[in-house]
From Swiss-Prot:
Gene Ontology MF terms in the entry: cyclosporin A binding; enzyme binding; heat shock protein binding; Hsp70 protein binding; Hsp90 protein binding; nuclear estrogen receptor binding; peptidyl-prolyl cis-trans isomerase activity; transcription factor binding
Region (Interaction with HSP90AB1): 214-370
Domain PPIase cyclophilin-type, residue spans: 19-183
Function text: PPIase that catalyzes the cis-trans isomerization of proline imidic peptide bonds in oligopeptides and may therefore assist protein folding. Proposed to act as a co-chaperone in HSP90 complexes such as in unligated steroid receptors heterocomplexes. Different co-chaperones seem to compete for association with HSP90 thus establishing distinct HSP90-co-chaperone-receptor complexes with the potential to exert tissue-specific receptor activity control. May have a preference for estrogen receptor complexes and is not found in glucocorticoid receptor complexes.
Subunit structure: Identified in ESR1 or NR3C1/GCR steroid receptor-chaperone complexes. Found in HSP90 chaperone complexes with kinase clients LCK or EIF2AK1. Two monomers associate with one HSP90 homodimer. Interacts with HSP90AA1. Interacts with HSP90AB1; PPID and FKBP4 compete for binding to HSP90AB1 and the interaction is mutually exclusive with the PPID:HSPA8 interaction. Interacts with HSPA8; PPID and STIP1 but not FKBP4 compete for binding to HSPA8 and the interaction is mutually exclusive with the PPID:HSP90AB1 interaction.
Keyword annotations of the record: Acetylation, Apoptosis, Chaperone, Cytoplasm, Isomerase, Nucleus, Phosphoprotein, Protein transport, Repeat, Rotamase, TPR repeat, Transport
Enzyme kind, highest EC tier: isomerase
GO biological process, one term: protein transport
InterPro entries in UniProt: Cyclophilin-like_dom_sf (IPR029000), Cyclophilin-type_PPIase_CS (IPR020892), Cyclophilin-type_PPIase_dom (IPR002130), TPR-like_helical_dom_sf (IPR011990), TPR_rpt (IPR019734)
Gene name linked to the record: Ppid
GO cellular component terms given for this protein: cytoplasm; cytosol; nucleolus; nucleoplasm; nucleus
SUPFAM superfamilies: Cyclophilin-like (SSF50891), TPR-like (SSF48452)
Full protein name: Peptidyl-prolyl cis-trans isomerase D
Length: 370
């Protein structure tokens, strides 16, 4: 008989907790903390716990360490699940359990009735090994076929980041890896707060913060704090860290926007726009021209007449040597703010670049037909 998933997190304080520190494309994005339902499926939970600690040594079937460390999420299907656990072949064809190559389905007590559930991947009945998946939506068609044995209690935002990684088919285009993993004992910190020395005291993902996302004043307070930290990194020319903090602001704002009244959304818009523009500025400093253009386009969706976005977008086009595109954006900006001297100076510079480019082309043609 199946039962609904536990409403509380954690469902049982005596159940083991484990963690994954996740890297996407070589960059640490955060920690997922999982409760294992040892009270309901002890054998399945123990298998996963030991694979997180690596305490069982080498697997007799694979000849590889029975450990998730360094193991990729090899399969991602948006609005379905993220899958990993193949520590031997790293492509979905390998892995093994701590009990041998495979072990039986323990029970189907819990349903796949929401996101954030941890369940065993298999190749049919009684073929559990080391591979697992985390649901990102309810998946009722898997009930009675896959053993649900845990749940995400912190770091659901990290799971969502994995879910939204670009894929080729079902394979992530960027390497998504369990960089570190282990068990959290009673009294251990869960590791969801940043430790970057910036003074940032907020969890990286709003889902993990003990706040009411409908409290707009609180969200604005947190957002201003994070933005100021981002500005400090910007001033010290630490562009990557600045982007991380501005992006974190946007996560908090987006989570709040999803649950508040439309009238309150407008209160969040100015700081959101500012952070998107600042991300664009950082990308310009990093010579990430297309990234800067994309950020400016995002800003222009919020405010189509924003001259700062048009100006920075033009700088991105210049980096790509698309001077005609840059000229078009600067002309739009000048129409909106005809007295802006910075726009005028940039416009003159781009016109000179276009002239120099044309003169160079003429010289090439002249040599060809001389």
């Amino acid at each position: 008989m199946s039962h609904p998933s536990p409403a509380g997190k954690p469902s049982n304080s005596k159940n083991p907790r484990v963690f994954f520190d996740v890297d996407i494309g070589g960059e640490r994005v955060g920690r997922i903390v999982l409760e294992l339902f040892a009270d309901i499926v002890p054998k399945t939970a123990e298998n996963f716990r030991a694979l997180c600690t690596g305490e069982k040594g080498t697997g007799p079937t694979t000849g590889k360490p029975l450990h998730f460390k360094g193991c990729p999420f090899h399969r991602i299907i948006k609005k379905f699940m993220i899958q990993g656990g193949d520590f031997s072949n790293q492509n979905g064809t390998g892995g093994e359990s701590i009990y041998g190559e495979k072990f039986e389905d323990e029970n189907f007590h819990y349903k796949h009735d929401r996101e954030g559930l941890l369940s065993m991947a298999n190749a049919g009945p009684n073929t559990n090994g080391s591979q697992f998946f985390i649901t990102t939506v309810p998946t009722p068609h898997l009930d009675g076929k896959h053993v649900v044995f845990g749940q995400v209690i912190k770091g659901l935002g990290v799971a969502r980041m994995l879910e939204n990684v670009e894929v080729n088919g079902e394979k992530p285009a960027k390497l998504c890896v369990i960089a570190e993993c282990g068990e959290l004992k009673e009294g251990d910190e869960w590791g969801i707060f940043p430790k970057d020395g910036s003074g940032d005291s907020h969890p990286d993902f709003p889902e993990d913060a003990d706040i009411d996302l409908k409290d707009v004043d609180k969200i604005l307070l947190i957002s201003e704090d994070l933005k100021n930290i981002g500005n400090t990194f910007f001033k010290s020319q630490n562009w990557e860290m600045a982007i991380k903090k501005y992006a974190k602001v946007l996560r908090y704002l987006d989570s709040s926007k999803a649950v508040i009244e439309k009238a309150d959304v407008s209160r969040l818009q100015p700081i959101a726009l500012s952070c998107v523009l600042n991300i664009g500025a950082c990308k310009l400093k990093m010579s990430n021209w297309q990234g800067a253009i994309d950020s400016c386009l995002e800003a222009l969706e919020m405010d189509p007449s924003n001259t700062k976005a048009l100006y920075r977008k033009a700088q991105g086009w210049q980096g790509l040597k698309e001077y005609d595109q840059a000229l078009a954006d600067l002309k739009k900006a000048q129409e909106i703010a005809p007295g802006d001297k910075a726009i005028q100076a940039e416009l003159l510079k781009v016109k000179q670049m276009i002239k120099a480019q044309k003169d160079k082309e003429k010289a090439v043609y002249a040599k060809m037909f001389a």
